[in-house]
Amino acid sequence: MATKLLALSLSFCFLLLGGCFALREQPEQNECQLERLNALEPDNRIESEGGLIETWNPNNKQFRCAGVALSRATLQHNALRRPYYSNAPQEIFIQQGNGYFGMVFPGCPETFEEPQESEQGEGRRYRDRHQKVNRFREGDIIAVPTGIVFWMYNDQDTPVIAVSLTDIRSSNNQLDQMPRRFYLAGNHEQEFLRYQHQQGGKQEQENEGNNIFSGFKRDFLEDAFNVNRHIVDRLQGRNEDEEKGAIVKVKGGLSIISPPEKQARHQRGSRQEEDEDEDEERQPRHQRGSRQEEEEDEDEERQPRHQRRRGEEEEEDKKERRGSQKGKSRRQGDNGLEETVCTAKLRLNIGPSSSPDIYNPEAGRIKTVTSLDLPVLRWLKLSAEHGSLHKNAMFVPHYNLNANSIIYALKGRARLQVVNCNGNTVFDGELEAGRALTVPQNYAVAAKSLSDRFSYVAFKTNDRAGIARLAGTSSVINNLPLDVVAATFNLQRNEARQLKSNNPFKFLVPARQSENRASA
């Protein structure tokens, strides 16, 4: 019987995640006819005892076109974001800080447990058991599948800032096109509720700040948990201060079960990846260089420019070869279950300390994560990119082949230009820290940094998002025959040759010397 129940639970878990090969729902007609894009700030702020949650309006036209919702949570020291689950998959980027997070997968075993001598109660030993708890750090991408309970905790003095994208157009979302948070505790306001009312949604109950247990009758919960009424009242959030909110302060901090070697690394302030399987997978990249940005820049600038350019190209070529090799192996023997749900890797670091996929010491760096790097993203149908640009450096005009891109500025500011299918400029302005810009699929975009260092994270609505460059080596123009370029643009052959070959860079173009002198 127990075996059947476990099998049933695991089957249910696969059903939760099993939309991995389903198509993403398409936007409604005319939703993506955007004449103007805007760099948006959060327009809703909900304070909590231990932090705050800010949200962007998901009814905004550009978010509706992309089918996503965006939010940002800030956790103070010893703050816990209460467990919740969502009606759509999430990608969470850790902009600042480090701490713990956990997820609960139905049917998976409780693999972490306390020592026997750790706790006693009512004359018998009790050992806490639970599913795996992970550490996160700045630069991590965390993948949260639909319906999976998620929580996070900040055990450090530095506030944690986590930016979350919810893919509400995912085929795994069987509700309406509105993000929903199902909290397991508290009686606070649901962060996207006000937008639901703006959209014309009906008020479901008088008290709209209750948790998922609040609607059950007490006797049901007393029988279900075999506990007394006092505990049930706490479970339902009765008489709790609404100001406690979704992020609560933990007096004295949480006691987290964690392997000793991980605790030791954390106490030493180690920047290494903490999961052994991540270390093994990423070791070749770290051997190629895992120093901080400034150290790499100083070392690399002593190299001749042609060597640096070749290094950038080789790095990208290696990335492409890795992708093609992985894709080939999966086509040959892919059953869709290379890793089980219970042991799936849920995070990967793409921050500035990780080895970049594209690097130019005079221009900047880019790091991407797709389902080839983090297989759980195949369930979510999402990917991400982290990049930084030096002052006046440029990311050449390009477009996303198969994904919408939501660019969130982390630091500094840059000038971006976005062009639609009619050749009209739909955005020509600055994107500064804390703002977000949606770039729809196939819209062309280029960026130039206006700060000493502009950094961003881009969430993409495809687990293998691809880019086509419109300028530079290996670009669309560069790969057209010379005579085709000349005839297409009505150029002389020598002019066409200049158009194809004058930019020796692939992605990142350093500032011109005249611009450097002017900025100095």
Curated annotation (Swiss-Prot):
Record GO terms (molecular function): nutrient reservoir activity
Disulfide bonds: C32-C65, C108-C342
Residue ranges of every copy of the Cupin type-1 domain listed in the record: 37-233, 348-497
Signal peptide residues on this chain, from the entry's feature table: 1-22
SMART domains: Cupin_1
Region (Disordered): 250-339
Domain of life the protein comes from: Eukaryota
Sorted UniProt keywords: Disulfide bond, Seed storage protein, Signal, Storage protein
Record has Disulfide bond as a keyword: yes
Gene3D superfamilies listed in its UniProt record: Jelly Rolls (2.60.120.10)
Function description: This protein found in the seeds of many leguminous and non-leguminous plants is the source of sulfur-containing amino acids in seed meals.
PANTHER family: GLYCININ G3, OS03G0336100 PROTEIN-RELATED
Subunit structure: Hexamer; each subunit is composed of an acidic and a basic chain derived from a single precursor and linked by a disulfide bond.
Family: Belongs to the 11S seed storage protein (globulins) family.
Name of this chain's protein: Legumin A2
Native organism: Pisum sativum (Garden pea)
Lineage: Eukaryota, Viridiplantae, Streptophyta, Embryophyta, Tracheophyta
